[in-house]
Structures are given as C-alpha cells and as structure tokens.
From Swiss-Prot:
Organism: Oryza sativa subsp. japonica (Rice)
Domain F-box, chain residue ranges per copy: 220-268
Kelch repeats: 380-430, 432-483, 485-537, 545-597, 599-629
Protein name: Adagio-like protein 3
UniProt PTM: FMN binds covalently to cysteine after exposure to blue light and is reversed in the dark.
Primary location recorded for the protein, binned into one broad class: nucleus
C-alpha cells in the first residue's frame, strides 16, 4: 500500500475532478448529454484488451458505470465517494461504504471475516501490486451484493497524481453483471491464514487418497497451510516460469494455483520485466501466459514462414537500417545508386489487414546516410546515430516521434560525442539510453570504445564507459540487451594482430554496475556446435534472456539460416543448435532484421544482384500465432 505520510498539494486537483464526476452523474439523471470536453476527462470505461466484437459491445452499451473514489494518502485506501450506480448495483448505501476499503465486496456476507474462496487470489494480488506501484489496473473480479448475490466486476483502477507527482486518489470504474456460478463448487479448499487445524492429505484431496492411511499432522507439509494469496504473491510469483510449471505437478491445489493466468503473468513479469510483458501482451493477445511462457522457454512452437506485403520502397537501396516500433517496421536511409546516401523514412504496419510500405511525410529529415543504426526508444520514438553521409562519416543523433501529428526528425544537441563512425553497433537500455560500440573511422581504423547517451536528460551528454579491458576493435558486430542492464556483444570483423578476421567471440558487460567491465564468455558445447565466425549477422534477445544468432557474412559453406541459441547467464554458457521447420531466408542481415513484440523476428526481403526485394519478408515465429488456433 502507499505510504500514508504527508503528501499534500494534489487534493485540489482531484477535488475538481470529483466535482466533475458529480456533475456528470446529475446530468445523466436529468437526461442531459455530456459535451465532448467533459468526455475527454477520461471516465469512459474501456474493457481490458478491448471488446471482442459487436455483440459484446452492444451488451455493455448504455450500462451505467459504478464509480468509486478512494483516498490514497490515508491508510488502506478508504472510500470517499460512490455514485448512485454503485449503490444500485451492490445494494450498499453510500453511508455504509464511506470510510471503508472496497474489499468488502469480496465477502459474500457483510459479517464475513474473509473473502469468498471463489474470489481469484491472483487478481487480488495483481490489484495490490498495481496500487503499490501507482499504475493502472484493468481486470475482472468476482464480487457480491449486500444480499449475497454474486456479481462479475469489470474493474478499472486509475491512479490520480497531485502536483508533487505522488498518487493522492484512486478512481475505480466498475461494470457489474450477474454471475451465474455455483458458489458451492470450490475446486480446492482455501484455509485461513491463521489456523490451529493441520489438515492431513486426505482432507486436501480425499478423492485421490481414499486408500492411503491417515498421516500424522506433524508430517503434513506446512507450506500448504498458507493462504492461496500468500502462496501466489509471495512465493510462486518469484519463481521462474519453468519452476512454476514443475510445481504445478505436485498436487491438485498447486495445479489449480499455477494454471491461473494472472499468476502466470506475475511470474513472467517478475522474471522478464514489466516492459517486456507489456510488449508481449500487445503482440500475443489471447495466447495465454501459461502457454506463452512454455513456448518461449522450450521454443517448441518456433517456425519460419514467408509472406509478401504491398507498397514500394523507392528509390531502391541497400545498407539501410530498420527497427520495430510496436507492430510497425520502420526503415530509414540507405545507400542508393552510385553510393547516394538516402534520407527518407518508410513504415510497414503489420496490424493492417493488407500491410504495405508507405513513406512517412516528415517536415525535416537527418542528412542522408548508410551504415548507420536505427534504434527504438520508449513509446513511439526512434533514434538514429552515425553512418556515412555525403560529406563523410557522421556522429550526430536524431530522434523521431512516429505518432506525432506532424512527424519531425529532431537533432539532439549532445556534449562530448564519440568519433564519427559507420558499421558500428547500438542498442537501448531502459528505452531511453543509447549505447554505441565499435565501428570504423574515416581512415579505416577499427574502434573498440563504448559510449552511452541518456536521452532523458535536459542536456544529454555522451559518456564513455571506462573499462580496464576492451574486446578487440571491430565492426559489423551485434550488441544486445539481456537481464535489463546487461550487454551481449558477438562476432563482427575484428582486429587480430595486423589482420582483420571474422569473429565468433562473445562478451558481456553489466552496465548497471558501478564499474562496468567487459568479460569474455567461455562458451562450451560439442566440437563445431557454436556459430561460425561472421559479421553483419542477426542477434535476437529473447524475453527470458537467451540470445539467438543467425545470418550474416560467413566464410566457407556454412548455412546463414542455421540458428544458434545461448543463455549468457548460465554458469557455463553452452551453444545449442535450433532446428526450426518452415521456409527460412537464404540470407539475413542484422541491419535489415527486426524483432516485433518479443516473439516475431522479421527478415526484410532477399536481393537479386544489387537490388533488394523489400516486399518479401521471412518471419521467425517464436510462439504460436493466436489465429493458428482458429
């Protein structure tokens, strides 16, 4: 829960919004329409994940939303306002509710001491987590009227911030509907958190233990006496997805707990990070967290497919750079005819019924370039760095908000920039910090430095990450993020004495440490099982922290489409080969490959001679597509 300390300063803002709520309620009762300005305040209900179709939309249309306001400054979020729709839906009068926490709706009887066993503890835990973090919650929860009748509550909790940035109030928007459920059908017993009764195994699951002699209570596993909420929120959610799946086979109760999708989401969120799970939720939609965690862990559903898209990227080009923004692919720049640097931007919306390339009309563009990097930042922002322009190599930084009404490339004035370069590698940390590594200078010298630029600063300044040792200078390598703050470098054309050779070495650095250091990974595996030396290849960072390597420029007869998997966090990292069915691309290059939503790897086209075919895409699907089950 939020700290109940002194957080004054925001009450006036929320008080005005509470008055707006009251005014809107009175207008509704009098049959008056609310104008557009008042509708934009944000009190319109939108179900989690959107409505499934017109029938469902019609079912909810016109239903009055129950509104509750709680004080986040006081202990336990006491209710300070309810509207008439709440009173009508729940049977509780306002004077019976004000000053209490809204959890009483989880009790079937007003005199009950704890919530009903059919109330999903994982949803309750998710609500608590969102309140603790001051973020919005959307979900469905079983509630009860004052007379004990069950209701489904489609709930949306919106935190309101004061002028000082602290959460001062929480708005609850609720849509209640009748729940036709058997309240006596409890799939597993839920014990009180404080209980002197120690049940034996027969009492836990009598049907499956009819012929087993009674076991003394002293031999009963104490952990099973914990409440479902404690087991889910404090223990199971902190384990890895693989461990949770294993625990689900222990007994019936654990099976029921671990198959819950809210728990699975908490497990994935704690293991992979909130930003990753948000992207996965947007891209995989109704796949389910249990199935998604299994498929991303085992890669059992991985497959290649080929498809075509419309539109054209003209003039034709090579050596461009591409990245993904949500479910959109963005392409910038490239090398045209007679080594002409290009400065245009194209986008491909994969959510469209018929995806096609279209040129983005921008009011200003960076100087044309090729051999640069294009990286995704938070939201709909992109960042371009370096490359080879009309007048030589560059070290400038430009950002673009793809969702702006008038998209404009804006140059970021930054202090202490690194040397101008091309064929370097870059990635982003926390969606806001640009990391640049290596590359080649104007004179052809290979670089081994690593720079960081925090784009959230009012005056961004480049900072070289000082290390006591650096990997050999190189270009055409990859730089990936795993474990939130850790960097993984692989391959490239590296300096080896007086020679420049393709590399298959791997290095890691934890940028979150006080003194980050590069460390070479001592990888293991059967002879010849690791990826052959290469440059300009593809490195895919999976949500679970593992890395997939394929493609690039490889010496000899090795196949660029062969996939190699490595977990750099293992005590002894070991390369493994992935055999994936489907139609892989003949060639794949790092600058023209994008990762969409954490589960889709898009390789842009092939090429005939010098001409790239950007209407042909190969997709490596790391998880099942929801439409495959239809």
């Amino acid at each position: 829960m939020f700290d109940a300390g002194d957080r004054g300063g925001g009450g006036g803002v929320v008080a005005v919004k509470r008055m707006k709520l009251c005014e809107e309620e009175e207008e509704e009762e009098e049959g008056m329409e609310v104008d557009e300005e008042e509708e934009e305040v944000g009190w319109v209900w939108r179900p989690p994940g959107g409505l499934a179709g017109e029938d469902e939309a019609a079912a909810w249309e016109g239903r009055a939303a129950a509104i509750v306001v709680s004080d986040a400054v006081e202990v336990d979020f006491p209710v300070i306002y309810v509207n008439a729709a709440f009173e009508a839906a729940t049977g509780y009068r306002a004077d019976e509710v004000l000053g209490r926490n809204c959890r009483f709706l989880q009790f079937r009887d007003p005199r009950a001491q704890r919530r009903h066993p059919l109330v999903d503890p994982m949803v309750v835990s998710e609500i608590r987590r969102c309140l603790n973090e001051g973020i919005e919650f959307q979900g469905e929860l079983l509630n009860f009227r004052k007379d004990g009748a069950p209701l489904y509550n489609r709930l949306r909790l919106i935190p309101m911030h004061g002028d000082d940035g602290f959460v001062t109030h929480v708005i609850g928007i609720q849509l209640f509907s009748e729940a036709n459920i058997d309240l006596s059908n409890v799939s597993y017993p839920v014990y009180k958190q404080q209980s002197n009764h120690r049940p034996n195994i027969q009492e836990i699951n009598p049907a499956s233990h009819e012929h087993i002699p009674k076991i003394q209570s002293s031999e009963y596993c104490c952990i099973l006496q914990l409440s479902d909420e404690v087991l889910a929120h404090n223990i199971l959610s902190r384990l890895s997805p693989r461990d949770v799946a294993s625990i689900g086979s222990v007994c019936t109760r654990m099976h029921e707990l671990t198959k819950n999708d809210h728990l699975r989401k908490m497990v994935c969120q704690n293991a992979w990070g909130r930003d990753v799970t948000v992207r996965l939720e947007m891209s995989t939609k109704m796949l389910g967290w249990g199935r998604l965690a299994r498929e991303l862990t085992t890669l059992e559903a991985a497959s290649w497919r080929k498809f075509t898209v419309g539109g054209r990227v003209e003039p034709s080009r090579c050596n461009f750079s591409a990245c993904a923004v949500g479910n959109r692919l963005v392409l910038f720049g490239g090398e045209g005819v007679n080594m002409q640097p290009m400065d245009d931007t194209f986008v491909l919306n994969l959510e469209s019924a018929k995806p096609e390339w279209r040129r983005v009309k921008v009011s200003a563009s960076p100087p044309g370039r090729w051999g640069h990097t294009l990286s995704w930042l938070n939201g709909s922002w992109l960042v371009v760095f370096g490359g080879c322009g009309q007048q030589g190599l560059l070290n400038d930084v430009f950002v673009l908000d793809l969702d702006a009404k008038q998209p404009t490339w804006r140059e970021v004035a930054s202090e202490g920039p690194p040397l101008p370069r091309s064929w370097h590698s870059s990635c982003t940390l926390d969606g806001s910090k640009l990391v640049v590594s290596g590359g080649c200078t104007e004179s052809g010298v290979l670089l081994s430095d690593t720079f960081l630029l925090d784009l959230t600063k009012e005056k961004p300044a480049w900072k070289e990450i000082p290390t006591s040792w650096s990997p050999p200078s190189r270009l055409g390598h990859t730089l990936s993020v795993f474990g939130k703050t850790k960097l993984f470098m692989f391959g490239g054309l590296a300096k080896s004495g007086s020679l420049r050779l393709r590399s298959c070495d791997a290095y890691t650095m934890d940028a979150g440490e006080d003194s980050p250091q590069w460390r070479q990974l001592a990888t293991t595996g059967f002879p010849s099982i690791g990826p052959p030396p290469r440059l300009d290849h593809v490195a895919v960072s999976l949500p679970c922290g593992r890395i997939i390597i394929f493609g690039g420029s490889i010496a000899g007869l090795h196949s660029p489409s062969q996939l190699f998997l490595l977990d750099p966090a293992e005590e002894k990292p070991t390369w493994r080969i992935l055999n994936v069915p489907g139609q892989p691309p003949k060639f794949a290059w790092g600058h023209s490959t994008c990762v969409v939503g954490g589960t889709r790897v898009l390789v842009l086209g092939g090429h005939t001679g010098e001409e790239w075919i950007l209407n042909e895409l190969h997709e490596l699907c790391l998880a099942s597509r929801p439409d495959e089950d239809e």
